[in-house]
């Protein structure tokens, strides 16, 4: 009898557990069903969206693309916009990317804000110029053991207008164990005067979802979508001397700028410091040397931090900063364009301001990592 009673109790508890689980599923579905909601943009435009998704993805579904270098993972802080009503409380995941003044001005990260009620936001008008493009891969070049150059030919008569230095967000396709598409940001390396195709330079990042797809799965003839152009890192139209500093795939936007300057026939004094570990990490050297012949006053200076014995390297070594003294003629008439890791950007910026007297507002950079 006791054994039978135990069996009955277990059956009863199991039934209760099933009922509770069912109720929780129904409740979760009911609570997460926010229905149709309105996103008001700049007090001018209303969008009707299905609630429950992030503000970033909700806008993307309506072909409004806010910059997001990390693809909405909350790790880049690029998708900032003002949320004046309906955004809910500021999340701990947002605070590291927002200054005190930004928080006081209702700035939020669009990827962290969930659309759970009608919401009012402010975004720059330039965002409306960002589009989704369709392309075909027409060329893949191995620049080094871990860097490729890829050419995307636009389809359906599409053209793209961008400034030298800007970037696009590449949409991956599912592959292997990666079942969903992701978006990652890459700088355009081609000149803006060619508007029916773009070139990107992409370095393989270990276990990187997008770079693994590009290096191991992407092939000529594949169809690929991307959005853009994005970014405030672009060449300023002045007569100031230029100091370029980059490393690795950071050569991409600098190459775009140099190609553009070649087209317009600039007379500006330019120096380009390219940081690498060994000679295996140097690429497009002949093209850089061709710029030295083309421009009236351009110098390409590669600097190796860890040259190997068999490199037979006779050039500059160590950090790039000590060599800036060769290039900076007039700090008050010099602009710097930096592209590389956050650590490199911070170190170079500090040196330019403290050691060489450049104004911080004349230092432009594209930080990735």
What is the meaning of each model-derived region?
Residues 165, 250, 341:
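Short, conserved phosphate/pyrophosphate- and ester-handling motifs at nucleotide-, phospho-/glycolipid
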Residues 19-26, 30, 96-153, 158:
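Fe-S ferredoxin-like electron-transfer domains
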Residues 132-222, 276-278, 303-306:
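Ferredoxin-reductase
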Residues 70, 76-79, 111:
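Short cysteine clusters
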Residues 2-72, 83-105, 273-369:
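Reductase modules of NAD(P)H-dependent flavoproteins
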Residues 227-240:
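A short, basic/flexible loop-to-alpha-helix module at the beginning of a structural domain
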Residues 78, 120, 167, 222-223:
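Residue-level marker of beta-strand positions
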